[in-house]
Amino acid sequence: MRVKICGITQPQQSVAIASLGATALGFICVPSSPRYVTAAQIWAAVAPLPKNIDKIGVFANSSIAEIKQTVIDCGLTGVQLHGDETPEFCDQLRRSLPQVEILKALRVRSLEHLEQAIIYTQYINTLLLDAYHPQQLGGTGQTLDWQMLHKFHPSCPWLLAGGLTPDNILEALSQLNPDGIDLSSGVERKPGDKDLDKVALLFEKLGSRN
């Protein structure tokens, strides 16, 4: 199962989190976010990582040109779209960056949002389902209604996000079978500052499932 830790801001933490077991790291390219990092900061965190770690930039309502430039400058392997991007935009981006994984994050609060998610599947590589918040795009600490997702079986891989922590991850995975999980605020001391003890506890809990 993929494990993505999002909102990385410090190079030394990126290396430590990868060594603890993360398969993907996320870097926030949204200037209004408290976890925002510049291209130079992303490169500093990405450069020492092993090749097998996915390096994903998180964007919201950015232009294709801006996204493409950041991918090139930072050596990103994936782009996560967390804004109001349309399926058509996702398709254009995927054609523009054919070697890069395209993830679309959707903030879910109703079955209608889940139906919308299905529309995206043919234009992207991976879906990410997050909790809805009217102001914030992610990292809110709010959980999804897991029960609503019981019958969610999209045609592409999907990641579960939204308020996941080392304390509730086993409960979430007992109810759902996502292809991966995405954590941010649930393993932090404060926005952008990851708590390595919590990250270690997360992988300890995940290891106990085997």
Swiss-Prot record:
HAMAP family according to UniProt: PRAI (MF_00135)
Organism: Trichormus variabilis (strain ATCC 29413 / PCC 7937)
The family this protein is said to belong to: Belongs to the TrpF family.
EC number: 5.3.1.24
Alphabetized InterPro entries for the sequence: Aldolase_TIM, PRAI_dom, RibuloseP-bd_barrel, TrpF_fam
Pathway(s) of this molecule: Amino-acid biosynthesis; L-tryptophan biosynthesis; L-tryptophan from chorismate: step 3/5
Protein name: N-(5'-phosphoribosyl)anthranilate isomerase
Biological process, per Gene Ontology: L-tryptophan biosynthetic process
Pfam families tied to this protein: PRAI (PF00697)
Keywords from the UniProt entry: Amino-acid biosynthesis, Aromatic amino acid biosynthesis, Isomerase, Tryptophan biosynthesis
Catalyzed reaction equations: N-(5-phospho-beta-D-ribosyl)anthranilate = 1-(2-carboxyphenylamino)-1-deoxy-D-ribulose 5-phosphate
Molecular-function GO terms, alphabetical: phosphoribosylanthranilate isomerase activity
